[in-house]
Amino acid sequence: MGVCSWISVPGADRDSSAVASAIAEHLSPTGLLLQEIYRNPAAQYRHYDHNLTRIELSGSYKQEEHAVIDQIGQGFRYAAFHADSYIRRGNHTIWGSAGYRTGRTMHTVWNESADFELLYPYVWGDSVGGSLSSEHYTFEGGYARRFGRWTWGIQADYRAEIEYRTVDPRPRNVVSDLNLSTGASLAVGKQYTVGLHIEAQIYRQSSSMRFLAPLGGPKEYQMLGLGMYSVRFSTGGDQSSVYYKGGSYGIGVELFPDNGRGWFALLHYSRWRVKRILPDAPYQKLPLTTLNDSRADVEFGWIRHGVLHRWGFKTHGTLANRRGTEHIYGDASGSSNYPLLGSVQQYLNNRNRAEVVCLWGMERPNGWSLYTECNGQYAAFEARYLDPARRMQFSKAGGGADVIVGIRRGHGMLRFTLCSSYLATLTSDLLTTGLDPESAIGQALRDTYARLRSGLLLYGVSLHWSHIWQCNTAFYVDGTWKHGSFDDGNRVDYARIACGIAF
């Protein structure tokens, strides 16, 4: 979670002071403690006290010396455009955003599908891989209205993505991802509001493969998890394809203070389901696997503002489990239909996480501000394949701290942040029954396990500068750099630079 100073600009004209206050409010560290509450569209009605529109250009870079997860790659190079707006008028609030991103994901292997984290382990891939180019579009819009003690809101966001490679193997992935949510809230007493929201997702991805080399290309494996793959349906044919059809639903309950000061809590549950389908002849839209993922989140915390000081804390816990089912088919009949003989649940994955965040800040009348944030966290991951028995497990614990110094002088604002954290390995285990450790798949699985279980030291700096013009507009620049060192010697670097205008 990023944090920054809360800055006002006394002495400036009314318009420039308003945009300065809006920028500071959108970057407020105490406000970010409440971020999960605003999944309820009704809560967006009082998300901010000031209206703000931002238009931004950015570039980002990430490079891992060795890919921690081969299927995600060694990093990326992206250029992006993003615009967002939040406007409140009387009892009405509207918000929205639009974005475009283009670039490359570097050196992926054993995965030719998009959205690996959504679909794993049910992707298809090969031992060659390579860098992937992509174009990514996002659109979001929402509306909330207050009726006395009641508030109602609705939100929709849509993501479209095209991912491809121009050398063999040549995947082409097209993603369509629509999310809808609606919610209501009721003011109880003079300070608090209780909210309820529901959400739904519709997800589609078509993934096709081509080889232009005269001798064809590598075998495309239909992955089943922990080095397992479907022998029967893994092919190396040109113009083969995979189709993903899925969606999710969720429900959340929230308690939060009207003025952003006091106790807050939430409980959220969601369930995700997606089928991997083989659409080409002779399979005739055959469902190969079904993936189910359930997740429950619970959070509570407290925020207080004094004359000079701010305090806050929150605790967050997540329990998630993923279950994968393989469908078993008989031989195709004369009509090319494969009879379904049965289904078996073979893949199980549990992910648990707990985090505690504590925040203290001080705002001085002379324009200086200082914030410190400390956090502790625990994470556990376990994946199992039932027959043959395979298992990957690791758990980690650690903590970190951020120090943020802010200053404002006239129409200028500056924020400097130092951050550091360390995650240490507590337990780890790998069981690979029946897997040849010298095979390409066996070596890839062992390398991934070694990197995932490794402890990580992460540190970095960020800088924000903005200048308020008299015409109710601000120009700003954001820069971030982070470096990570793993206990096994692997390294990762991340950098992002952005500039934009706000009004």
Q: What function would you assign to each model-found segment?
A:
Residues W6-M106:
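N-terminal, post-signal peptide beta-strand-biased segments of exported outer-membrane/organellar beta-barrel
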Residues D15-V19, K190, R491-F503:
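Outer-membrane beta-barrel "beta-signal"
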Residues D49-I55, G90-G96, G148-I154, K190-L196, ...:
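Outer-envelope beta-barrel architecture signal
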Residues L57-E65, Y100-R104, R145-R149, Y158-I162, ...:
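Transmembrane beta-strands of outer-membrane beta-barrel pores
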Residues E65, G75-F81, S133-F139, R172-L180, ...:
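Residues that define the transmembrane beta-barrel architecture of outer-membrane proteins
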Residues E65-I72, H107-S113, Y164-P171, S207-A213, ...:
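Outer-membrane beta-barrel translocator domains and adjoining extracellular loop/strand segments
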Residues F81-I87, F139-R145, L180-L186, I251-P257, ...:
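Residues on the lipid-exposed face of transmembrane beta-strands in outer-membrane beta-barrel proteins
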Residues S230-C374:
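Long, internal scaffold/assembly segments composed of regular secondary structure
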